[in-house]
Structure formats: C-alpha cells, structure tokens
C-alpha cells in the first residue's frame, strides 16, 4: 500500500472516530425503549433497502460471469446480499422485540439526511448509490463501467462509516435493552470486520498520481461529512451544528492539505 493510500485510509479512520463520537453522545444519557425505536427504524431501512438492488444486479449480471464480469466480483456481491439480508433481519427482529409489534418494510424510516447521502454518492457512482440505498434503477451496463474505479473504491472505503455504529453499540452494557442492542450489533460487526480493508485494497492499484489522491480524498470527505449529518439526524441530533462542523474539520485535518 503506497503512502497516499495510507493517508486516505487514515482520513477514513478519522471520520469513523467522528461518527463514533455522535453515537457515544446519544448513549451518554439514559435512554428508554421508545428512545431506541426511531434510530433502529432508520438503521433497519439502511440494511433492508440494499437487498432488492443487489438481488436485481446479481440476476442481470449472471449471464456476464467470466465475460464482462469477473467471477470473484460476482461472488463478493453474493456475499454482500447475504450480509445485508442477515443484518436487516437482525435489526428488524430487534425492533419487534423492543416495540412488541410486527415490523415490515413500511414501518422503516428513510430520513432526509440519508436521502442526501444517496444523492452525493450518486454524483460519483450511480450504480453504487443504488446498491447501497435502493434508490434509482440499476443496470448491467452501469455496473460494468470502467471509468469510475477510483470513485467506487473511495465510496467503499467510507461504507458503513468503518463500522462506527456497530462498534459503539457492540460495547454497550450487557443487560436490558442495551444488552439486546449490543448482541445484535456485535453479530453485525463480526461480518463487517471481514470487509474493513476492502476500500484500501481497491484504492491501492488506482491511486498513482496526485490528481488520483485529490479525487479520492475529495470523495471521502464529501461522503463522510454527509455521513456525520446523517448519523446525527438518525440519533435525534445529540450534537449541535457547531459540534458537528468541528468533528468534520478535525477529520479533514487528518491529512492536512490532502498532500
């Protein structure tokens, strides 16, 4: 891994720490069952909404295996489908357990800042934005594109905020509602650990020039900065606008001048 890619992974790690700070701020105060329903409904949406577009992509790409689509990439997409399905099931089961009510997709929340995150990702890779959010229409032609490799790798490096939410929730106390939350998100975290270096590995052969580095850093900052606003909204704004801006500024400072 070259020096510039190490700097990009450092940048993504700084944003992961910033995202963790938001989640920590929420859990710093005592919370009742009702306090958890909104953020869990939003998280369940994020997991569930990826299932259909990945399934559709797999069906469309199947005839292209070893022709236009590498079999290893196809396998990776099948693993992602399995993970997202499992994670959606875990979070929705948790919602039912806490609320005492049957939960279906119509009960989940797609919040405004998450919608904005989808739009920002779509500026750089419409196909990846669709796979991650379930928004838009996916096509085999879009997935086969070879002219947005850096963009896709940079987005991958930011995906899930580096597991920030899962990490914080997995470390909650072991009893009561928080104990149930901790168990579910620890299970999800274990799945995410296997993918944690995929963005860096994808960027390694692509970032060859200063322009490549600047492009990737710009995408990481834009996507990750919006992730902070998304996460703060999801948890009911535990941090003020100024506090959020300071987290963003500090994270960007991880690679001063991006050079």
Q: What do the PLM-derived regions correspond to, one by one?
A:
Residues 1-259:
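Non-heme di-metal
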């Amino acid at each position: 891994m070259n020096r510039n890619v190490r700097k990009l992974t450092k940048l993504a790690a700084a944003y992961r720490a910033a995202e963790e700070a938001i989640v920590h701020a929420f859990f710093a105060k005592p919370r009742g069952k009702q306090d958890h329903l909104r953020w869990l409904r939003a998280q369940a949406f994020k997991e569930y909404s990826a299932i259909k577009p990945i399934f559709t992509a797999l069906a469309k790409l199947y005839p292209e295996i070893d022709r236009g689509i590498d079999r290893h990439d196809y396998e990776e997409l099948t693993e992602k489908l399995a993970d997202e399905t499992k994670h959606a099931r875990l979070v929705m089961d948790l919602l039912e357990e806490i609320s005492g009510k049957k939960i279906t997709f119509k009960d989940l929340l797609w919040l405004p800042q998450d919608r904005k995150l989808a739009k920002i990702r779509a500026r750089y890779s419409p196909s990846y934005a669709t796979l991650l959010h379930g928004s838009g229409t996916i096509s085999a032609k879009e997935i086969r594109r070879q002219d947005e490799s850096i963009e896709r790798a940079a987005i991958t490096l930011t995906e899930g905020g580096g597991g920030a939410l899962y990490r914080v929730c997995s470390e909650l106390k072991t009893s009561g509602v928080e104990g149930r939350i901790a168990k579910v998100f620890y299970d999800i975290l274990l799945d995410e650990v296997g993918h944690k270096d995929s963005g860096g590995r994808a960027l390694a052969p692509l970032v060859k020039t200063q322009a490549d580095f600047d492009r990737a850093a710009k995408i990481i900052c834009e996507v990750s900065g919006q992730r902070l606003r998304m996460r703060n909204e999801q948890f009911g704004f535990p941090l003020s606008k100024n506090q959020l801006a300071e987290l963003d500024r500090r994270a960007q400072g991880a690679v001063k001048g991006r050079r």
